[in-house]
Amino acid sequence: MIKRVHLGQGKAEEILDLPNLIEIQLNSYEKFLQLERLKTNRPLLNEGLESVFRDVFPMKSSNGEVALEYEKYYIEYNSLSFTEKECKRKGQSYEAVLKIRLNLQFLTTGEIRQKDVYMGTIPLMTDRGTFIVNGAERVIVSQIHRSPGVVFYKEKDLYYARIIPYRGSWLEFEIDSKKDYLYVKIDRKKRILVTLFLRALGLNTRERIIETFYKIRKIEVNEDTKREITGQYLATNIIIKENMTYRAGDKITLQDIEDFLQNGVKEIDLIDFDGYDSVPGKHFISSDVILNCFEKEDAYFSLKDGFKELSRESVMLAVYSVLLPGEPISIDNAESDLRNVFFSEKRYDLGHVGRYKLSKKFGLDDLTTSVLTMTDIVNTISHLLRIYDGHDVLDDIDHLGNRRVRSVGELLTNIYKGAMSRVEKIAKDRMSNKEVFNLKPQELISVKPIVSAVKEFFATSQLSQFMDQVNPLAELTHKRRLNALGPGGLSRDRAGFEVRDVHYTHYGRMCPIETPEGPNIGLIVSLATYAKVNDYGFLETPYRKVVDGKVTDEIEYLSAIDEEKKCIAQANAAVNAEGNYIDDLISVRVSGDYTTMIPKNIDYMDVSPRQLISVSSALIPFLEHNDANRALMGSNMQRQAVPLLFPQPPIVGTGMERIVAKDSGVVVKAKRSGIVVLATSKKIVIRPEDAADDHDLDEYELAKYERTNQDTSFNHSVLVKEGQVVNKGEIIADGPATRYGEVALGNNLLVGFIPWNGFNYEDAILISERIIKEDLYTSIHIKEFSIEVRETKLGPEKVTADIPNVSGKILNKLDENGIVRIGTYVKPGDILIGKVTPKSEGDITPEFKLLTSIFGEKAKDVKNNSLKVPHGTEGTVIDVQRITKDDVSNLPPGVDEILKVYIAKKRKLKEGDKMAGRHGNKGVVAKILPVEDMPYLADGTPLDICLNPLGVPSRMNIGQLMESQLGLAGKYLGEYYDVPVFESATNECIQEKLKKAGFNETSKAVLYDGYTGEPFENEVMVGIIYMLKLHHLVDDKMHARSTGPYSLVSQQPLGGKAQFGGQRLGEMEVWALEAYGAAHTLQELLTVKSDDMSGRVKIYENIVKGIPTNVSGIPESFNVLMQELRGLGFDLSIYDDKGNQIPLTEKEEELINKT
């Protein structure tokens, strides 16, 4: 194990240990399946799968005679046919059978029939947080989406309030600030006046609406108050005589006051616009928008002056025609339909998150009601009008209080909810249709919708992804990813800049650095190191509590909503041993503002400087000295580093390397403390301290050269010896890209920042041959090739070494069964599996028929259908798998067996491979120079790698220089360093280490030219830099074509390596050749090498026969042009120099021949 020296400015030990880095996956799935609770007691009723079944059951028949009740569910572990490893090898899914116990109750007789009903299979999560589906490891990525609840926002001149439920219709209110009207939209349909909507929901008079939204004051009517009353609005109706009525919401004129005085009206109720804030707990408004809506109503329904209230019929007609246009209407039905849209639990569900958000927004205590209430609607309208008047502020849609995370468990719960609603429908139909008393519970439940929904989700959902398994970091990051795309999320094209941007609430929750470059930037992000997801799905981050200016060790997790307006100090603020701040003014954050405060006003303090970034970014030393764009590239490229044969841990690390290796799941950890009894390359056996008897041993199977999803090699190497004592949780075997229990993605190289003969121009890299000879960047890549042996109409296909028309030389790599031998080195075109397929009669030539009729020979009527090594692949066969129906019961229909061949290739670093450091400093290897030609130090040590110094200043990633300097000191002092992010070693500290190692404090040295032995004119900065080899290998990209497939439509060669295609010769390339006057080159490129069908056959014939040739026919594209011109009415024909017509098509040829 490596001893690391802590060189950070802070303390070596953290206040709070990092949580398990894949707990977002494990916890969410445990919440869904509740496996631990199933073993001991009842699962929680409102969580996961249990809640799905509780929502659907009990089911009752329409006549009320039969009820189907749910008791419990359980997982049949004995139904697991294969282990995780076997599932991968045999292409199966790692899943178990789900059963539920149902009671069918006959309410008339009291009889109960109980049965455990099969509910399909359910994929199980491995302890690494992944699923194995059809033999491949997959990850369900967490989705970040708009939280249910209410949001207030503004677009152009419109103010909006939107109530978003978890399930059900969206309700949207909008104020048009130009016209001062308030409208409602249901599910983004046509808009309705808000007063009409409120009347439809039960506030059926003007008086009731005014009473709900406005403060009312009483005032005496007399000569003194005349002036005050004029122009005010009535709050209640006044009826003096039949022809003298005044409506609530009408404006009072001087004439009206005269009428009041004449008719003895002593006191009236007015709307008090100024008293909107005077009643605690009431959200009154000061806006006349609702009164304007009354006027608009009058115009809409053509109500003349005089006392008229809208009838219930006309209101319902207006609202229902928008809700369900074109439907026949009955008033009672319309009213119940409208109420069902928002107030029925069957059709509307705010979810506990939506209810929490609504109650939090309006200061209510209710956390249980799952539907909307009239109070919610009134509060929403009031709040929107208060915002419009400037008494309240708008919401920020991108605030993390308005976005929440849906992880595996919740996504699966939703899938099961959808499937179970279909199951319920079918069951209810069966209850009413069948002879009820002969029924059994299992006959009512149709399991098809569930099976297909779960299968579809795991196989095809946008959030179920093929795991990125290039290296342990890629694996870990994939499980911690947050995706804003996917079903119910954003779409790439419609997502604007604001959604993608970094928001102040991301601090400690989402990483501001790690995100893809390209169209997904900002939509796919990573969880910050300490972040957790709370019960409501909101992201939380931990803080240390500060009481009266004193920092305590009490840790509190805060969501973005809880953190609002809190005053938070940075983790590196100076604190003495008692927990008091040393400085008088402390730098703090308050809701996105950065300021200074006295210690007494501080509420919380960060737990660690690395809490705001993700795991990938936390692996970059001296991150704070890099430009953010380069840090983004650095964190993304570490995930593409190929696992090497001999990796080294970085000399300059950040302290995260061990944690990442431990939580990624690629290393082997001891389950219990004990003594190692056996340690071989394939197996470790430990006798635990608390062993019950001699047979109680812990066995660990190690993986040897297994293929990952990305064709890299997964290999364990043992770290313990027999007789060694190990502790629980200790790493006993390294995995890919780990060394001594730490992540090791690359190697430490001696670097010089110096241009060398133009070979490192434009980020190219010059490297020493020593790297190749010592296999420092050699990696193993394993490819899988498979072939199916089918049952055809003409008989079964056969795997055999007896293949027609194949020479013995080709067959000598196969064994007697026609399968390639393990250990054989194969090249493109070699046969891996010999397979013959019966030929149909149509395939047989007349000569062959004659031979068979003479000799009666039927043995040769088969055709060669063998599996061959494709172009660009070579290597050693390391394994062959045969999967037959005896191994796996569910082979695809018509398939007798599947054979898989694994070919491993050792790839050394070569020109054209991409390399990168951890600071976004990437480049392509341009030349591999002999060691003796490399520039060397005064003591004769040659450099390993030369980087261009021009790659540093404009990119502003100074971190690579500081890493190189400290690495140099570490190399010569034999030390490994921890340099934590945001509290890195200072320049003084680095210089001190360099002096101690005997170097100049700038780490600049005189370099000598390997060619001449002369020193270079200026001193050169040298150091030790950590470089990675990326998964962009030249061998995978190099490609050449001689002859290959052509497109059916255009008859031109296909493009791309996968299709074995050619290089496109575009119009600019044609211009270049025209400019050179290269007529013959141009002619063959545009005809026989492209789409001249007859010409290319002829030229091939001539080449085979050895005849010098210059064939040119008519290219297919010319024929297309001809036909297009003919379509426009031109009659075109072509003649040679003798005046004979040249046929363009076969039809023309026939016509010419006839004439």
UniProtKB/Swiss-Prot annotation:
It holds the Pfam family RNA_pol_Rpb2_45. InterPro entries: DNA-dir_RNA_pol_bsu_ext_1_sf (IPR042107), DNA-dir_RNA_pol_bsu_external_1 (IPR019462), DNA-dir_RNA_pol_su2 (IPR015712), DNA-dir_RNAP_su2_dom (IPR007120), DNA-dir_RNAP_su2_hyb_sf (IPR037033), RNA_pol_bsu_bac (IPR010243), RNA_pol_bsu_CS (IPR007121), RNA_pol_bsu_protrusion (IPR007644). It is an enzyme of class 2 (transferase). Its EC number is 2.7.7.6. It comes from the Bacteria. GO terms for cellular component: DNA-directed RNA polymerase complex. GO terms for biological process: DNA-templated transcription. Keywords: DNA-directed RNA polymerase, Nucleotidyltransferase, Transcription, Transferase. It catalyses: RNA(n) + a ribonucleoside 5'-triphosphate = RNA(n+1) + diphosphate. GO terms for molecular function: DNA binding; DNA-directed RNA polymerase activity; ribonucleoside binding. Belongs to the RNA polymerase beta chain family. NCBIfam families: PRK00405.1 (NF001616), rpoB (TIGR02013). DNA-dependent RNA polymerase catalyzes the transcription of DNA into RNA using the four ribonucleoside triphosphates as substrates. The RNAP catalytic core consists of 2 alpha, 1 beta, 1 beta' and 1 omega subunit. When a sigma factor is associated with the core the holoenzyme is formed, which can initiate transcription. This is DNA-directed RNA polymerase subunit beta. The gene is rpoB.
